[in-house]
From Swiss-Prot:
Keywords: Isomerase, Magnesium, Metal-binding, Phosphoprotein
Recorded family membership: Belongs to the phosphohexose mutase family.
Role, per record: Catalyzes the conversion of glucosamine-6-phosphate to glucosamine-1-phosphate. Also catalyzes the isomerization of glucose-1-phosphate to glucose-6-phosphate, but at a 5-fold lower rate.
Lineage: Archaea, Methanobacteriati, Methanobacteriota, Methanomada group, Methanococci
UniProt cross-references to PANTHER family, sorted A to Z: PHOSPHOMANNOMUTASE (PTHR43771:SF1)
Pfam families, A to Z: PGM_PMM_I (PF02878), PGM_PMM_II (PF02879), PGM_PMM_III (PF02880), PGM_PMM_IV (PF00408)
Single biological process term from Gene Ontology: carbohydrate metabolic process
Quaternary state and interactors: Monomer. Also forms large aggregates.
E.C. no: 5.4.2.10
Descriptive protein name: Phosphoglucosamine mutase
Cofactor note: Binds 1 Mg(2+) ion per subunit.
Keyword Isomerase among record annotations: yes
Name of the gene: glmM
Gene Ontology MF terms in the entry: magnesium ion binding; phosphoglucosamine mutase activity
């Protein structure tokens, strides 16, 4: 049975028996674990089940309660591994399990496959009564993270900030840490509720409409509030500018990369194959190299360690700040957006509007999982003929041009093939998208 997707285990109505087996499998090679959970109603159930499996295999467990993923990832340094019970941006009926190494990086596919093999082969090591693991509670994890982040923050301006936590794990840290950093904070959806009663946890324009309206209302009197919104476990963030615009993920990432290079003199940053070409164009004048890697925080973190780059970010709002820790951190990212504003002495909308605007298109085509590889093989060969270019196959199939690019990639969690296009001209973007969709559909039908 395949359990792990592109970001740990995520399932609708996650079976606690699966969680128990995951815990039991972990205990074979790890003997000291820390566990946290987000606000989902099934969080206690899944945490209890995975804890039972860990204990049965002789692994000691420290529980830190309801916390954001960045807190769990930071805490993992004191244990053999960290376990986060979360389904991130998915709806409330979902839950999941994400595993972290001591250094804060998420488990890579090889590590996850090893656990799957233990589970599928029933290769467990059950302990005798006198070797069962024990459970302790640590109520200081949030405080330790809080203090560590503030010690490494360089913010002297008292910004006005609306913080939207989606009734999720960010509630226990984000409003307070922005306040402690000197901001005047208005909290939205800031009480913990695993039903996500205020909005769904995906921080997109549709779900953030009420928060946008609040910011527009506040700023009608010239108050200059910006917004920081999180997903379900606060490993991501998106900003809302003073005009009430949910910032484009790609443009925010490009602006932040430029800021880091200008401020620190960094000679390289890491991003993924689906990020905007505006990043290269923005950083070329500073001689900084853009290193592209596979989609996902695991690949980004691995590349950061390999290259020594100080920052890696995805256009999903998943950013890793290597100088602080290797866990994606939406809380720290939000604070550092404010540092960027202070550095330039500009409003957020002014910074974002300086980033080049290109035509971006995204489509997804239904595709049975068993046909995905055939489709990608066809797209690679056919695309090479059509575009008269060698495909880039780091993650999916990508063709790059002087004025744009197309990426065709199978979803790792759903029965879709995704087509992403970016171009400087709308006509070229539409042409690329039409060609991409046609290739995928032909690859599926075989005709």
């Amino acid at each position: 049975m395949k359990l792990f997707g592109t970001s740990g285990i995520r399932m609708k109505n996650l079976d606690p028996l699966i969680a128990y087996k995951v815990g039991f499998a972990i205990s074979k090679n790890f003997k000291k674990a820390v566990i946290g959970r987000d606000t989902r109603t099934t969080g206690n159930l899944i945490e209890s089940a995975i804890t039972a499996g860990l204990l049965n295999g002789g692994c000691d467990v420290t529980t830190i309660g309801m916390v954001p993923t960045p807190v769990l990832g930071y805490s993992a340094k004191d244990y053999d591994l960290g376990i986060m019970i979360t389904a991130s941006h998915n709806p409330p009926e979902y839950n999941g399990i994400k595993l972290f190494n001591k250094n804060g990086t998420a488990f890579d596919p090889k590590q996850e496959k090893e656990l799957e093999n233990i589970i599928n082969n029933d290769d467990f090591n059950e302990c005798t009564w006198d070797n069962i693991g024990c459970v302790v509670e640590d109520k200081t994890a949030v405080k330790k993270y809080f203090e560590y982040i503030l010690q490494n923050l360089n913010l002297n301006t008292n910004f006005n900030v609306v913080v939207d936590c989606a009734n999720a794990a960010g509630c226990v840290v984000s409003p307070n840490i922005f306040t402690e950093a000197g901001c005047k904070v208005i909290s939205v959806n800031s009480h913990c509720d695993g039903r996500f009663v205020g909005r769904m946890p995906e921080p997109n324009e549709t779900n953030l409409k009420e928060t946008v309206d609040i910011i527009k209302g506040l700023n009608s009197n010239g108050r200059n509030y910006v917004g920081i919104a999180h997903d379900g476990d606060a490993d991501r963030m998106i900003a809302i500018d003073e005009l009430g615009r949910v910032t484009d993920f790609d443009k925010l990432l490009a602006a932040f990369c430029k800021y880091l290079v200008q401020k620190t003199g960094a000679d390289k940053i890491v991003t993924t194959v689906d990020a905007s070409m505006a990043i290269e164009e923005y950083l070329n004048e500073f001689g900084a190299k853009v290193i592209r890697t596979k989609i996902g925080d695991v690949a980004v973190a691995e590349e950061l360690e390999k290259t020594g780059a100080i920052f890696g970010g995805e256009p999903s709002g998943t950013w890793i700040h290597r100088d602080i820790h290797l866990t994606p951190d939406g809380i720290l990212s939000g604070l550092r957006v404010l540092e960027m504003m202070e550095f330039y002495g500009k409003k957020l909308h002014e910074i974002i509007d300086e980033v080049p605007s290109y035509c971006n298109m995204r489509e997804k085509i239904s595709c049975p999982d068993n046909l995905k590889q055939n489709v990608m093989d066809y797209v690679s060969k056919e695309g090479e003929k059509i575009f008269e270019k060698k495909p880039e196959t780091l993650d999916g199939v990508r063709f790059s041009f002087e004025n744009g690019w197309i990426l065709i990639r199978p979803s790792g969690t759903e029965s879709y093939v995704r087509v992403r296009v970016e171009a400087k001209e709308k006509d070229f973007a539409e042409k690329l998208m039409k060609t991409g969709i046609s290739m995928v559909k032909t690859g599926i039908s075989g005709k």
